[in-house]
């Protein structure tokens, strides 16, 4: 389950809890065959500007004409909605609550979690999106308490000069801190990176990408690559009109992305290349939606292919589990070392993997239950989906690869001197790990070594 868009950490805690609880309510309804569509639309119509009929502001923003920032304009447009949110906060402070209030308690969320553990429709991963400068120790703990296992985070650039000229609002040091916090808490890190920003060139972008995986402080597990495209409401319009910024040509972008693909390590998954923006909204910039395919075709013409996970997934291929080799890729991180365990075919096609974090044992952890623990950050087996308990010849899922990966992680952690192996399990996978020797902790599950 992915909560896309915006800065999740900006929202009040009460709203965050309510929103996630409603996700688990929806999973419960869906698993039971309950359809509450009518109730939802009725509630939206009576109580929220999210309903199209209530979303009355119709303002066209032109970046070249803005006297205020884009966010300032939007805040002025939605002043009424912001006032309503403040009033709700005041009511909550006075312990008042109405049926349509976007509010739930931690106890209500935890009860929804418990129901989902063995529900027909389980949450096997929960993702939110935020900014580096909005992450703190307390926020990371809150995100984990919600049940999240992965965080999408906008790096955009690893150049302070580029971040500053594009008014990003934070520096590279904030990104370093955020990645370290997330990694220490065991989260999977899904970064966003934007070439062709104001102040960048194809050459500096390639250097930026080399830094992304060359420096231990970064090295994300997954990555979205969003080359900058110009839309009319962006302040970048005025720079384009003055000739201070221009989009990369097709060939410039193609050569840059070929270099990017060649530099991507096997432990990273390039989940998306090119953002889905309607071509009619793009003033200038790339409008080719299958640019990834063009890059892969260009690599193939050179006798190469991307080493990233997505390019190597077995997907619908028949898999002989006995013929797979267990490969280990060790690398440094900002908290210690990482081990990327993967079951691969002869052509390095990937059938399953596990991410194991090995933090410095003596280094203090801001999460008490992780002190001195190695951490399984992800276990994933590829191939066609199967029902729980189902098996099928030639399918990677439910063929024992996950258990074999876990047992190898146990061996590595014990050999490295750890007395405990923690896992950042999703709500719907708690039962799976209990069957494999893990006990419930406060925010994680643990197996003594």
Residue ranges, per PLM feature:
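Conserved non-cysteine loop/helix-boundary elements of the Radical SAM core domain that shape
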Residues: 6-24, 43-190, 194-251, 255, ...
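Short, electropositive alpha-helical surface patch
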Residues: 14-21, 201-217, 278-296, 433-444
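Active-site/acyl-donor-binding loops of N-acyltransferases
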Residues: 229, 424-431, 435-449
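C-terminal accessory regions of radical SAM enzymes
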Residues: 244-361
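Conserved acyl-donor/pantetheine-binding loop and adjacent beta-alpha core of acyl/acetyltransferases
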Residues: 344-393
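Conserved acetyl-CoA-binding loop-helix of GNAT-fold acetyltransferases
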Residues: 392-413
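Conserved GNAT acetyl-CoA-binding A-motif
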Residues: 411-425
């Amino acid at each position: 389950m992915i909560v896309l868009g915006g800065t999740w950490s900006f929202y009040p805690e009460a709203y965050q809890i309510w929103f996630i609880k409603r996700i688990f309510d929806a999973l419960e309804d869906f698993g039971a065959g309950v359809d509450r569509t009518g109730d939802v639309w009725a509630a939206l119509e009576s109580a929220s500007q999210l309903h199209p009929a209530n979303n009355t502001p119709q303002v066209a923003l032109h970046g070249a004409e803005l006297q205020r920032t884009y966010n300032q304009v939007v805040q002025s447009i939605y002043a009424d909605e912001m006032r309503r949110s403040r009033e709700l906060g005041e009511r909550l402070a006075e312990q008042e609550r109405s049926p349509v209030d976007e509010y739930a308690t931690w106890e209500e969320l935890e009860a929804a979690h418990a129901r989902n553990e063995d529900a027909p429709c389980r949450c096997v991963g929960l993702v939110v999106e935020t900014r580096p400068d909005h992450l703190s120790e307390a926020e990371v703990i809150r995100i984990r308490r919600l049940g999240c296992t992965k965080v999408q985070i906008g790096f955009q650039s690893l150049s302070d000069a580029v971040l500053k000229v594009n008014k990003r609002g934070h520096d590279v040091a904030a990104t370093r801190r955020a990645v370290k916090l997330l990694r220490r808490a065991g989260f999977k890190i899904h970064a966003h990176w934007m070439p062709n920003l104001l102040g960048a060139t194809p050459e500096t972008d390639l250097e930026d990408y080399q830094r992304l995986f060359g420096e231990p402080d970064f090295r994300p597990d997954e990555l979205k690559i969003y080359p900058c495209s110009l839309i009319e409401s962006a302040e970048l319009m005025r720079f384009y009109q003055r000739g201070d910024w221009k989009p990369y040509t097709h060939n410039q972008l193609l050569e840059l992305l070929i270099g990017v693909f060649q530099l991507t390590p096997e432990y990273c998954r390039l989940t998306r290349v090119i953002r889905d923006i309607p071509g009619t909204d793009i003033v200038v910039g790339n409008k080719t939606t299958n640019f990834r395919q063009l890059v892969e075709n260009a690599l193939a013409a050179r006798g190469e292919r991307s080493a990233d996970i997505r390019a190597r997934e077995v997907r619908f291929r028949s898999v002989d589990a006995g013929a797979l080799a267990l490969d280990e890729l060790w690398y440094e991180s900002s908290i210690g070392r990482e081990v990327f365990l993967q079951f691969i075919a002869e052509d390095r096609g990937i059938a399953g993997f596990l991410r194991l974090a090995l933090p410095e044992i003596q280094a203090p952890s801001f999460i008490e239950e992780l002190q001195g623990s190695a951490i399984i950050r992800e276990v994933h087996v590829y191939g066609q989906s199967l029902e729980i308990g189902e098996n099928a010849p030639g399918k990677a899922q439910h063929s024992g690869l996950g258990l074999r990966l876990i047992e190898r992680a146990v061996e590595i952690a014990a050999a490295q001197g750890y007395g405990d192996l923690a896992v950042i399990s999703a709500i719907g996978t708690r039962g799976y790990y209990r069957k494999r020797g893990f006990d419930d902790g406060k925010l994680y599950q643990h197996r003594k070594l």
